[in-house]
Amino acid sequence: MDSVIFAAIAVLLSKLLTNNNESPFFYNCLACLFVGLFILTFSKILESAGWLATTTNYIWPICFILIHFYLLKEFIFKNRDISKFKRSIIYLILIITLLEAISSEQLLVMVGGAYLFTIVYCLYKKIEIPKLIYLFIIIILFNFIYDFCCPGNINRVKVVTKLGFPDYANFNIINKLDVGINYFLSWILMAKDLFSVIFLALLGVYTYLISNKNKITIITLIPCLAVLFFASLRFANFTTVYSYFDLTNLKHGLLSLGFIRMLSCGVMYLIITLIPLYSIYLIYKDNKKLGYFIFVLLILGFGSVIISGFTPSLTSDGRIYLNYLFVMIILDYLLVDKILEFKNKN
């Protein structure tokens, strides 16, 4: 069944992100390549709590939400003329896939954010918002209320805090944000996954291309080079320098460090944050829809990790990054498509 889920994710990526009908085989293979790389490179994370437990709790919901947004795009926003029976079936599938997806707390935050950004986009573009969207918003809000008020979740936090991380009880909102932001940025800076490195490289290349190869835009490749530098330190076994910047297992956040180390890591964090934001700004100037979409996906990926600072279980053996990694896969796939599209036009 997991094989079917992974295959479905690859197909849905191709269906959702490309409008190129000339070479569907290439784009399907590209999607399969990214999903296959994910399985190979993160099999240890998938096995950390048991393969079946991890895939059903993390991977299956991703498949469900891709199905949900594919149907939303193809049948709700395009308002296709179909029979009432087929429309009823689609509505039912939309509701079921949404409920299955938001059973995951991380995806609940991401899907809620996705719908918020969708509504903002529709209002800005003066696109009529389908009435069904309001039903989905209500479902999401009820799930938020349930997750935050459920006695079981409240007791679980108390038990995990007491047994696993007593210091968490003294964390204020600044500490929690600090921990979440540090986990996100340190993971990227230390090249803990291949897809973030690919994203930074593709983002720099695409920005350089659309800016008519303006030399100043070469700076957009700096984050990728910085990340590759730390990756080379790890493979060359220069553990002293690498360990100095590696804060991916730091439970108390960046603010708990000494001033010099905090400043050093903070500067690197600014580099891998501000320069990609500059790239996205240039993309937005060239193609507002694409720039907005990339920005939204990055915010959703960021949100999926930052909420780890609001739970005493913290990193959970890397599983907190699984949703973020699929955001990176989507962005990598999209940027490859846009770079090829740009080359074909020019």
Regions found by a protein language model. Give the residues of each.
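Signature aromatic-anchored transmembrane alpha helix within multi-pass, membrane-resident enzymes
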Residues: 221-224, 271-298, 340-346
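Short hydrophobic alpha-helices at membrane interfaces in multi-pass membrane enzymes
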Residues: 74-98, 134-135, 344-345
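Transmembrane alpha-helices and membrane-interface helical segments
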Residues: 11, 67-74, 114-122, 202-207, ...
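Transmembrane catalytic cores of multi-pass membrane glycosyltransferases
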Residues: 1, 52, 106-113, 120-123, ...
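Membrane-interface micro-motifs in multi-pass membrane enzymes
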Residues: 29-30, 34-73, 258-278, 302-332
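Membrane-interfacial loop-to-transmembrane alpha-helix junctions, especially the N-terminal start
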Residues: 22-32, 83-90, 128-136, 214-225, ...
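Transmembrane-helix motifs of polytopic, lipid-linked glycan transferases
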Residues: 3-29, 67
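Membrane-interface alpha helices of multi-pass inner-membrane proteins
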Residues: 85-111, 141-142
